[in-house]
Amino acid sequence: FELLSNADFISDFYLAGGTGLALQIGHRQSIDFDFFIPYDFDTSQIIQSILSLGHFELQNEEKNTINGILNHVRISFLGYKYSVINPFIYHRKIKIAHELDIAAMKLSAISGRGNKKDFIDLYFILKKYSLDTILRCYETKYGKSLSNEYHLIKSLLYFEDAEEQAMPKMIEKIEWERVKADIVKKVKESRLL
């Protein structure tokens, strides 16, 4: 993290995902770094910059996508066309997405696949923000109304895929059954139902 925070190119990107959230609320350990940029970028130029930081093992390179391991830590750089809607949090040169931007991204992730860590992250975000507030951010970020609310409701209430996944390493202890029950409760209290 310190190596990246001193790299010149990093100021063009912002950190989001589980690590971006964990740095703000301290709920769980997350050891991978997902950096986003809202426009196309030159992957070969970024790879050259990363190589100057230490041992880098490239795992995948596609248009606007770099996945690899830098000094034993998984890192990703992704072109992500959706705008950031809240002010960044800063750590040196690293911009970190606001909790509500990450919350909207978590809703999007859950609607596509139900990973346990995403549900757990959402559970902790819901301790601070209402689901309706997160839904408004989701609509603003992705520029669409919740035209497919039915799919989103089903996704938020479908835990089966996550059941077999291991719990992430938690800093703030929580039981999986509690996470599910609280999310169900928040969905029932929201404008979705």
Where are these regions (language model features)?
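Compositionally biased terminal segments of proteins
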Residues: 1-193
